[in-house]
């Protein structure tokens, strides 16, 4: 499976310090993202979720940017903060994107970060 860097990654990776430009392609080997032969991170790591996205459909940059827009919108502490979260919690179709470990706290699961664009657009349009 192919991944793409949707936001420049200049940080420590498993292989050491790296500087991966936006738009760079990576591939998966045994659950790890590989760039120029170097192991970068696990495909289920926070670094992967914040900088890299599944790109097998050619929409990796859009997917990555949408996940980050959703997270940012939900984190915004304004008068509509709770209303946005209530919309997420009340939509049973979104439970497939919630981690199961917590009954009273919403954490996005691996499926959210790999979701189809139409699902991510649905979530974003619901809360924007």
Q: What are the functions of these language-model segments?
A:
Residues 15-120:
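Acidic, low-complexity, intrinsically disordered interaction modules
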Residues 1, 125-128:
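Short intrinsically disordered terminal tails
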Residues 3-11:
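A short beta-strand micro-motif
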């Amino acid at each position: 499976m192919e991944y793409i860097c949707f936001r420049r990654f200049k940080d420590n990776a498993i292989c050491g310090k790296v500087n991966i430009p936006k738009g760079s392609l990576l591939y998966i080997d045994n659950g790890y993202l590989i760039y120029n032969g170097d192991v970068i991170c696990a495909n289920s790591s926070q670094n992967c979720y914040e900088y890299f996205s599944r790109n097998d459909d050619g929409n990796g940059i859009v997917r990555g940017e949408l996940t980050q827009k959703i997270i940012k919108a939900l984190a915004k502490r304004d008068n509509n903060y709770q209303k946005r979260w209530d919309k997420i919690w009340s939509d049973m179709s979104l439970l497939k994107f919630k981690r199961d470990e917590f009954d009273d706290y919403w954490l996005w699961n691996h499926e959210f970060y790999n979701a189809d664009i139409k699902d991510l657009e649905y979530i974003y349009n619901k809360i924007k």
